[in-house]
Amino acid sequence: MKTLGKVSDFVGKYMAAIVIVVAAGALFFPGPFSVVKTAWVNNLLGIVMFGMGLTLKPEDFKVVFSRPKDVIVGCVAQFTLMPFLAWALTQVFHLPTELAIGVILVGTCPGGTSSNVMTYLSKGDVALSVGMTAVSTVLAPLLTPLLTLLYAGQRVDVNPMSMFMSIVKVVLVPIALGFVVNHFFHKFTEEAVRVLPLVSTTAIVLIICAVVSANSAKIMTSGLLILVVVILHNVLGYLTGFGVGKLLKLDSTKCRAISIEVGMQNSGLATSLAAAHFAQYPLATIPGAVFSVWHNISGAILANFFARTAEKKD
């Protein structure tokens, strides 16, 4: 377990670099990577969500009751800013339908699991970040389908009930199972959690392999446009999230947490939903995969910037 723990620490530390290398390999040499099928995406995401559940404790939800205003502000920002920004970018760049669906799905999904780590590295309010991730994830089965219907319903048929069931099965059930296992077998999970970065990164890398290798030719023709839109969506999320915190006169640690939480999305879920519910639009899976690569890079850069500014103030 010690060796595995060291490997896991290494993988967690260099996750962004690993994801970039694998994504580039799947893009330029799709053949070897195509052994990973897009049909695996839901199961792989379930593994990531189960891992998230293993790290959750009842105390993580205390912030919801002890500081409801902070959590509400963060979650409202999450589910208003990112969906609107996604839709606005699809209009500004006149994205074709299949790319637009993918971008909108990224915007309507809850906060990403790695946002908590980035908040910690940024010297932000980790309790708030964990609380926001937990609450936005619980709200996702209801809000993600409805927001997708609102912003993408004019372009394509959206089945909110079917999406609701998918999110419950792929996200809530694995998280709940992980939470229960952690509660009843805490001594075991305390050891197992050490290898979670390895397991989660492997699952995310395999999702990216599946999506990028299956669509490499199409990415080559429209990849730059997707990348520009994804970067703008992510960066605008960081900026507007931070701006909301400042506007409401929250302290800097809370502003950092909200900024990162709003900007970083559960893009694996966006990819999963695109593959399951919009299979007739293969490119809809691409924005989620590109976001998965990019937000780990931008999140690390932003966390480093926030940490340095916090040190200067101290």
Task: Name these PLM-found stretches.
Residues M1-D314:
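Alpha-helical transmembrane segments of multi-pass small-molecule/ion transporters
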